[in-house]
Amino acid sequence: MTTNKRTLLCAGLTATAAPAAKATGLAAAAKAGVAPSVAGDAVTAAAEDFGHLIHRKPQAVLKPASAADIAELMSWAASRGLRVAARGQGHSVFGRVMAEGGVVLDMTSMRTIHDVQPDRISVDAGATWSAVLDAALPHGLTPPVLTNYLELSVGGTLVVGGIGPTTLRYGMQTDNVLALDVVTGDGRQLTCSPNSNPDLFDAIRAGLGQCGIITRATLRLVPAPQRVRRFNLFYADLRSLTADQRTVLTDGRFDQLQGAILPDGAGAWRYQLEGAVHHDGQAAPDNDAVLAGLSDQRSAAVISDLTYSEDLSAFARLESLLRSNGQWFHPHPWLLTFLRGSNAEQLAGDILAELNNSDVGPFGRITYYPMFTKALHTPLVRMPDESVAFPFNLIRIPASKDAAKADQMVAGNRVVYKRLRDAGGILYPVSAFPMSQNDWKDHFGPRWSLLRDAKQRYDPLATLTPGYTMF
C-alpha cells in the first residue's frame, strides 16, 4: 500500500481509495449508501485479540494512511450507525478493540517516526514502543516509562495508561505525553495538549478510546541510562517480600521496581523482588550497599549487569518461548488491579491462599509491588486514595487451550475484582471480565462526569470503541 492510499479489505477483494477529494473506495460507498459485506483474513484477525476469549467479527477492516482517512471513515460510519474501533497490535484481552458488525481501523498502517528532538519525539499512533526506542536511543534518549512488553502500539497504551518499572518515578506513559493529534468520534481532526483543547487531552489519555482516535503523539524523552544493574531477590513469604518492597520504595535505592509471586511448579509460590539501578559503566553500583538491610534469601539472588537495550529485551525472550510452546496463542484471562497500600499484604495473602499454580500457569505470575500514587497525574487513570498502591495482577498463561477452564478464570476474575473493589482496590482496565455501565461509573468515580461530558461533545452518537460496553 502506498503512503497516499488506504485499503478497505472486503468480500475477499481489495478496494483502493485515493485521497478524500476523490469519490472512490470508501467515499464512493458512502455516496452510494452501500456498506459492503466483508470476509477474508483481515476480518478474521480483527475478530480475535491476544485474550482469545471474545470473538466479534467486523463488517470491514480499514488500513488508513492518514488522519484524513480516519476522519472520512468516522463521518461515513456515524451516518450509518456503524461502530468503529482502532486496533494497534491487538493485545487487548477481552474484545475491547473489536467492533462487531462495524469497522476496525488497523493502525499498523500508520507507524511513522516523524521527529526526534532533545526532549521529545513525534510518532504515529500505530508505531510500537520498540520502534520509538530504536529511534530515540541513537540520540542517547528514551521515553521515561516503557511497558515490559515493547511490541505494543503507542496509541494502544496511551488509551489505558501504560505502566512500567519506572512508574514509581515518572508515572504512567500518559503522564509523559506532550501533545496528541486526534480524530474525534464525530470526525474532527484536532490537536490537544495541556494548553490546547485540554478537555479533550484529559479525555483521550486513559479514556479507553471513547472520545477519539489518536493518530499522532508527541512524547517526552529523557537521557537514557547506559547500563542497568538488575537485582532479582527471593523471599520466604509474602510478609518479608512486602516489608523489603516498602523499604526500597521509601529510600529510593532502585531506579526500577517491580515484584512478583511465581508458581514454583510444585504447588507452592516463590516471592520475588525485581529492582534495578541505572549507571554509566564508570561508577557501577556497589552490590553490598544496594542490598544493605534487606532480608532476602541472599544465596538465591540473581544479579546481572546489562546494557539498557539488553535489559529491555527480557520480555521478548519470554515471548519467543511462549510462541515456541504454543502458549502465546492460548487464552489469556488476565486481571489487573491496584490495591490500597494499607491492606495490600492482607488482601493479596487472602487471595493467594485460594489460588494454586494452575490458576496462573507455569509461565504466568502474580504481579505485586508498591508504587507512589503521587507520580501519577492523568485524570482518568484511577488509583486508590492513598499515597502508596500495589499493582496486583493475575497474569494467567494457561498451559492448555481449554475453553471451559478459561471461562472459569474469567468468572473468577469478576469475583476477585468485586472483592478487591469492596476493599478499596481499583481496576486497571486491561482485564478479562465483562463490565456494565454501572461498573464503569463506579470505576471512574468522581471522574465519570469528565468522560461522560467529553463523550457527548466529541462522540455524541457513541460510534467509538464499543468493546467496553460503556455508553
What residue ranges belong to the model's regions?
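Glycine-rich N-terminal segment of FAD-binding domains in flavoprotein oxidoreductases
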Residues: 50-147, 161
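N-terminal secretory signal peptides and thylakoid transit peptides that target proteins
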Residues: 1-15
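Activity-critical C-terminal alpha-helical subdomain
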Residues: 320-324, 333, 421-471
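C-terminal substrate-binding/cap subdomain adjacent to the FAD-binding core in PCMH-type
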Residues: 13, 178-346, 362
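Structural signature of FAD isoalloxazine-binding scaffolds in flavoprotein oxidoreductases
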Residues: 63, 93-114, 166-186, 213-217
